[in-house]
Amino acid sequence: MRMEYSEEAIKELYIQYWKCMISKDEAGLRNLMSDDYYLMHMTGTRQSADEFISGLLDGTFNYYSAVHDDIQVSVNGNTATMVGKSKVLAAVYGGGKNRWRLRGDFTLKKENENWKLTSSKASTY
């Protein structure tokens, strides 16, 4: 598989990730994540996929829109890293809607010829 194809597939995965977050699509998110996926929030809290998706579904995390400024991908065989930068309209932890400049540092691995998110770390830019 050409490197460019993998990079484009991973960029599309990032876009799909945000679409699933906005629509609260549990099945879609799980399809994008490895079984051992975890998210590290800006606060330093680490959550498993189950914990994070539960918070998404119960309204702890609400995402309304995402405009992607930049997506950088580096592929190394069957693993990859990605940095996505997006302006996100969100309301989290009971707060009001705010626009955030969110940076996600992701790790990925290839499972059965499909790229899966293995971790993400949230920060701002």
Regions found by a protein language model. Give the residues of each.
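A beta-strand edge to alpha-helix "cap/lid" segment located at domain peripheries
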Residues: 2-23, 27-31, 36-125
